[in-house]
Amino acid sequence: MKIEKCGWSEGLTSIKGNCHNFYTAISKDVTYKELKNLLNSKNIMLIDVREIWEILEYQKIPESINVPLDEVGEALQMNPRDFKEKYNEVKPSKSDS
């Protein structure tokens, strides 16, 4: 597996595998208040990777997009129309990072 710095976003690393390219950001813990402020500012796109049963049991995070973790790689490869149809949200673009 090859790990390299991505050219399109600071702080992201590309891990090139056989089928998909995955991108990870540097992990940063945020408080509830910080997250609430970020969501209110509209300067963040929060992808909630919990499973559907977790959303049903614990509720959806307001202003988040739910894409279960095992679907993230495939979801980010979808065309925008298919993403909108499946997740009922606008697909994030590389420039949103």
Swiss-Prot record:
The chain residues annotated with the modification N6-succinyllysine are: K84
Report any Pfam family annotated for this entry. Answer: Rhodanese
Q: Which residues cross the membrane?
A: none
Ranges for the Rhodanese domain?
32-84
SUPFAM superfamilies per record: Rhodanese/Cell cycle control phosphatase
Known InterPro entries for this protein?
Rhodanese-like_dom, Rhodanese-like_dom_sf
Name of protein:
Thiosulfate sulfurtransferase/rhodanese-like domain-containing protein 3
GN (gene name): TSTD3
